[in-house]
């Protein structure tokens, strides 16, 4: 059980969560602003 906890606390799980969150964020941005090269909330 200790080995399992050690494995779950290292890079594969952290990177999977990070890339999953990043992919979700990019999907949501592209859902609200499809094919946007310039985002409206950055222009002044």
Swiss-Prot record:
SUPFAM superfamilies: Subunit IX of photosystem I reaction centre, PsaJ. The chain crosses the membrane at residues 7-27. The keyword DNA damage does not apply. Coiled coil: none annotated. It is found in: Plastid, Chloroplast thylakoid membrane. It is a single-pass membrane protein. InterPro entries: PSI_PsaJ, PSI_PsaJ_sf. One of its GO terms (biological process) is photosynthesis. It holds the Pfam family PSI_PsaJ. Keywords: Chloroplast, Membrane, Photosynthesis, Photosystem I, Plastid, Thylakoid, Transmembrane, Transmembrane helix. GO terms for cellular component: chloroplast thylakoid membrane; photosystem I. It comes from the Eukaryota. PANTHER family: PHOTOSYSTEM I REACTION CENTER SUBUNIT IX, PTHR36082. May help in the organization of the PsaE and PsaF subunits. Belongs to the PsaJ family. HAMAP family: PSI_PsaJ. This is Photosystem I reaction center subunit IX. The lineage of its organism: Eukaryota, Viridiplantae, Streptophyta, Embryophyta, Tracheophyta. The gene is psaJ.
């Amino acid at each position: 059980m200790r080995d399992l906890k050690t494995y779950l606390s290292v890079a594969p799980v952290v990177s999977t969560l990070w890339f999953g969150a990043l992919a979700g964020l990019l999907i949501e941005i592209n859902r609200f602003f499809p094919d946007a090269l310039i985002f409206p909330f950055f222009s002044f």
